Regions:
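Solvent-exposed N-terminal domain segments of exported/luminal and surface proteins
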Residues: 53-95
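N-terminal secretory signal peptides that target proteins for export/translocation
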Residues: 1-13
């Protein structure tokens, strides 16, 4: 038979062990790294890629057969696409309001209304991709942290991005996925689907990283999945398993960054 004193001693010891274990769990929980919010992740990614410099700078680069210039200053922006480096022969200009104008030898020319939006979208798209993830804090952007996932042994935050109809442009229905490295906040992979021209899905792998005046530029390998609209979250596994078809490389040539210093 167990005595009353022995029983009390047992339960006292048992309670003490339970309390110590509970305190230990609390300490471990408090020491565990906290997952940052999606806004904190995107802010860090933009800062890491040179966002504060991009805010007020002129950026020049060549893409395929055209020359591009982006000027951002005090919240305003002008995107240009030119046929020659000096921007004399033909210059397309897209301003902050979304107005598109084409100049030929410095004189504005008429562009059919049916083509204006197509040209504007083309100019905007090249400039948008050239400085990603800059732009992910635009008012029309909705961001969601899906999870933390490994790709080729590297840990990434997987961020889903969608757009509101108001301010999201003609392609507001497109969906994006960004893979942002958990250690240094670089964007190493991007996937998106689109609805125009019968629609489709693409997966892009960043390579050839360069830092120019504090701004990160990368080129991309552009892949296509076997099916038209697979879940974007499936594409990293398909990439690792060599199930994607390489369509092209997207190369930003000779990028220049000229900071604008306000008076």
């Amino acid at each position: 038979m167990i005595s009353k004193n022995s029983a009390q001693k047992f339960f006292t010891t048992h309670n003490l062990v339970s309390i110590i274990a509970f305190i230990g769990i609390l300490i471990l929980a408090s020491c565990s790294p906290k997952t940052p919010s999606v806004q904190e992740i995107v802010d860090s990614a933009i800062a890491q890629s040179g966002g504060p410099t991009i805010d007020n700078a002129s950026i020049h680069f060549k893409f395929r057969d055209h020359y591009y210039r982006a000027t951002r200053e005090n919240g305003q922006r002008t995107f240009e696409r030119c046929m020659d480096k000096e921007c004399i022969l033909q210059r397309d200009v897209l301003d902050s309001k979304g107005d598109f104008t084409r100049f030929r030898e410095s004189a504005p020319i008429q562009v059919p209304d049916s083509m204006k939006q197509r040209y504007a979208n083309s100019v905007n798209s090249v400039h948008y991709f050239s400085v990603l993830p800059y732009g992910l804090n635009d008012p029309a952007v909705t961001k969601e942290l899906i999870d933390i996932h490994d790709v080729k042994g590297q840990s990434y935050y997987r961020i889903k991005v969608t757009f509101a109809q108001e301010g999201g442009g003609e392609d507001f229905q497109d969906q994006y996925m960004y893979w942002i490295a958990t250690d240094d906040y670089t964007v190493d992979y991007i996937a998106y689907n689109y609805q125009v021209d019968e629609g489709g899905t693409r997966f892009r792998e960043a390579f050839n990283e360069r830092i120019v005046n504090g701004v990160r530029f990368v080129d991309y390998r552009n892949y296509k999945p076997k099916t038209q609209f697979p879940p974007l979250t499936d594409l990293d596994a398909q990439f690792e398993n060599n199930e994607l078809k390489l369509l092209s490389t997207i190369e930003t040539e000779n990028p220049e960054v000229i900071p604008i210093v306000s008076n």
